[in-house]
Amino acid sequence: MAVPSVMVLPLLIVVFAGVYYVYNEVMRFMSKSVVRNKVVVITDAVSGMGSECARLFHAGGARLVLCGPSWDKLESLYDSLCSGSDPSQTFTPKLVLLDFSDMENISDVVSEICECYGCVDVLICNSSMKVKAPVQNLSLEMDKTIMDVNYFGPITLAKGVLPLMITRRTGQFVLVNSIQGKLALPFRTCYAASKHAVQAFFDCLRAEVEEFGISVSTISHTFINAGAENATPTEATPITATPTKATPTNPIWAYVCSKLNTHGVSPQILAQEIVRSVNRQSREVFLAHPVPTVALYIRALMPGCFFSVVSAGVRDGAMAEQLK
């Protein structure tokens, strides 16, 4: 009996939905089986994204080493994970106090992390510090602090665990970076510079360690769209927030502004992408909506056009305030 043509589209939708559901279930099962018994180190685990990531890996049976700058928040996350899990299916997380802004003690912390289980299977570098201000208002000390947290801290930790991975000829680095590691915007000089630097380091590392069976994944995302995911306080800058909602006069920037607050990524989505990247050993993931994606291509293919548009946005007073 022939299927009426009017039923073809609904049937295709049902079939597609079923395949999509089965695919997601299979991938979720594979993700859990891949991370089970793996030693996973998460930096800044107390952030919104870090805690979501910790929950997913903990539920998957990973042996977690949770790092963060606040012991109280680490203990709170520890209690949350342990109270909502089956002890027979999960491992008790280990906690390590880690503050990349204090580089003097970083070598001791790296040793403590390595001694937790004697090995590291997955290192997730999630720590980040943000600052937005005109370059003339940023001190050199602030530049150094940003570089410590966003660059020197992660690479010091990576170098510390690398010998363990080389000895075992297995391991994975996951860098949770920012779109500004590929696309620099005004009023974010030191932040964008640190993100470009750490991106370059892990890109180079990927080629160097592949022969040892070690993989490197970088995840570049737009801003994290969640109230709990606030930037780490930096310093009091002379920039004063303006309550005005003036619209940029440049039509291109007016469109961009209308998308700035709607094109973020949630901590939950980002954490799920990290688990998938570990499962698939993805080399590079770009987690962004169309506007920043198009901007990235314009920057690569038509740099002159990109620079002109960005400069026009800075000259536009309303746009400059929103960029800040």
UniProtKB/Swiss-Prot annotation:
This is Dehydrogenase/reductase SDR family member 7C-A. Putative oxidoreductase. GO terms for cellular component: extracellular region. Residues 1-17 form the signal peptide. Belongs to the short-chain dehydrogenases/reductases (SDR) family. One of its GO terms (biological process) is intracellular calcium ion homeostasis. Keywords: NAD, NADP, Oxidoreductase, Secreted, Signal. Pfam families: adh_short (PF00106). PANTHER family: DEHYDROGENASE_REDUCTASE SDR FAMILY MEMBER 7C-A, PTHR44668. Substrate binds at S178. The keyword NAD applies. It is found in: Secreted. Its EC number is 1.1.-.-. GO terms for molecular function: oxidoreductase activity, acting on the CH-OH group of donors, NAD or NADP as acceptor.
